[in-house]
């Protein structure tokens, strides 16, 4: 890990969403230098599952060697922001560094995102970052250090990053646009940069929302804290950059990233917005049996100041550096995938006259080509899947799940099916359930069969647009766990 140098001794660091997760990790790293930390977050009462409040964070910061000032701040409330800034200046004499970490997330498409969720994401992510920066800038300009760091991604305009969660992407990119604008506006006075993880980051909320074992696919929050510390050490001329945690730490001389991993050697989950070919990333994750970081964390609306890559689901170091898992150039450069039309046209056959005079069976694709072509389920595959599911049900499964699922399947052998895990012993069948479904899942029949047989991860299907979910996401997650138990039979 990156050692502390004492560079931040006496500096005042204002961090939003610092009661837990990434925000608190950055605070503790700075505290080891003897920095003053303003904990600007909402949580004042203990949460039954998400540990940490502004007061418990303050105790940890003091124990690490820093001086803490806990402030109740909802970044949607300009008055609370200004009040916290005033208290910080009154107690510490100024502000040297601002970290815009608080964020809200909902991985839902346009029609499934209620206006209140859109407003929340825009107000917390973009507006909150803008207002907090605006309030701190007069004091940052007076500082010899003068840094603003936003936890936001590079501006990758590939439409595939917008398609499934347009509102979230716009809101998150708003934070990144603040970096673009303010870096130029205050060039020479304040350094303004963005930091984003290459992989999923593990926090307490990840365990709650991602299920057992998800932490093995993540890195610790320490990698973000070390990367942020590296940025703070740099001069004001280092500005307008969109930094990936792993890259800047390599510049610091870090070669072995094992210390940041939760599980050494386990495949890691790449984060959003980094790959120019998202479909290739999805294939890579699925091929390595990885469940995306976005997972359930990002399927639910929560503040990243609480989730901040605690699950979501938001954000991701490793014990063994596996660049091949993160970059997988071979997935992006397979000409077979990009040139399928040649396989369909087969020009070499059209140029042979004897084919027209003496018809013969069509040449079969080679095994590799066959694996690249879409496979249709055989007749009755859906019905057979439900039969096996039915045989796997028990009162114990029903008690553990307590949900009714409806499947809207398109294509061959499609239609409406249901899985009732509320009734005694459980029920399955064709048509709509007798009771209203808690979760409705829409997808193609072949993808449905792959999903229940373990060949397609539900989260992967959701991220790639193959699966659409309406209803209770937490219950959808329970179904994924049930699928895992049944995969061997399917």
Curated annotation (Swiss-Prot):
Region (Disordered): 282-370
Pfam families: adh_short, SCP2
Residues where N6-(2-hydroxyisobutyryl)lysine is found: 42
Gene3D superfamilies referenced in this protein's UniProt entry, alphabetically: NAD(P)-binding Rossmann-like Domain, SCP2 sterol-binding domain
Source species, domain of life: Eukaryota
Subcellular location: Peroxisome; Mitochondrion
Family recorded in the similarity comment: Belongs to the short-chain dehydrogenases/reductases (SDR) family.
Name of protein: Hydroxysteroid dehydrogenase-like protein 2
Source species of the chain: Mus musculus
């Amino acid at each position: 890990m990156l050692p502390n140098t004492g560079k931040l001794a006496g500096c005042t660091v204002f961090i939003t969403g610092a009661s837990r997760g990434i925000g608190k990790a950055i605070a503790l790293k700075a505290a080891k230098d003897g920095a003053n930390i303003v904990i600007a977050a909402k949580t004042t009462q203990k949460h039954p599952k998400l540990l940490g409040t502004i007061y418990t964070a303050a105790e940890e910061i003091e124990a690490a060697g820093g001086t803490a000032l806990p402030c109740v701040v909802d970044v949607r409330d300009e008055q609370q922001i200004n009040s916290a800034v005033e208290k910080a200046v009154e107690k510490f004499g100024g502000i040297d560094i601002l970290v815009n970490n608080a964020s809200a997330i909902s991985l839902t498409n346009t029609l499934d995102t209620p206006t209140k969720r859109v407003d929340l994401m825009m107000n917390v992510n973009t507006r909150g970052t803008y207002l907090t920066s605006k309030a701190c800038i007069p004091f940052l300009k007076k500082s010899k250090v003068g840094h603003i760091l936003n936890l936001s991604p590079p501006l990758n305009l590939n439409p595939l990053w917008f398609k499934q969660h347009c509102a979230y992407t716009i809101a998150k990119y708003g934070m990144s646009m603040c970096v673009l604008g303010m870096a130029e506006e205050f060039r020479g006075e304040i350094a303004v940069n963005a930091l984003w993880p290459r992989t999923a980051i593990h926090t307490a909320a990840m365990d709650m929302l991602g299920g057992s074992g998800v932490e093995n696919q993540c890195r610790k929050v320490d990698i973000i804290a070390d990367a942020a510390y590296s940025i703070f050490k740099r001069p004001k001329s280092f500005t307008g950059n969109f930094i990936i945690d792993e890259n800047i730490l390599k510049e610091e001389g870090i070669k072995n990233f094992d210390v940041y991993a939760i599980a050494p050697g386990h495949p890691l989950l790449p984060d959003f917005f980094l790959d120019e070919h998202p479909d290739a990333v999805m294939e890579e994750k699925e091929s390595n049996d990885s469940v995306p970081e976005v997972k359930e964390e990002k399927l639910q609306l929560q503040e990243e100041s609480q989730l901040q890559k605690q699950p979501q689901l938001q954000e991701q170091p490793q014990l063994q550096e596996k660049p091949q898992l993160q970059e997988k150039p071979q997935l992006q450069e397979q000409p077979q995938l990009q040139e399928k039309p040649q396989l369909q046209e087969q020009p070499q056959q059209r140029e042979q006259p004897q084919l027209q005079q003496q018809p013969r069976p069509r040449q079969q694709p080679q095994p590799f080509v066959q694996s690249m072509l879409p496979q249709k389920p055989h007749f009755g595959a859906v019905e057979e899947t439900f039969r096996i599911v039915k045989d796997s049900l028990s009162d114990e499964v029903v008690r553990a799940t307590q949900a009714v699922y409806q499947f809207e399947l398109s294509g061959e052998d499609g239609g409406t099916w249901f899985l009732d895990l509320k009734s005694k012993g459980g029920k399955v069948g064709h048509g709509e359930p007798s009771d209203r479904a808690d979760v409705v899942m829409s997808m193609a029949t072949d993808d449905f069969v792959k999903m229940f047989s373990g060949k397609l991860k539900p989260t992967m299907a959701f991220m790639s647009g193959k699966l659409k979910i309406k209803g209770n996401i937490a219950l959808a997650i329970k179904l994924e766990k049930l699928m895992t138990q049944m995969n061997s039979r399917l």
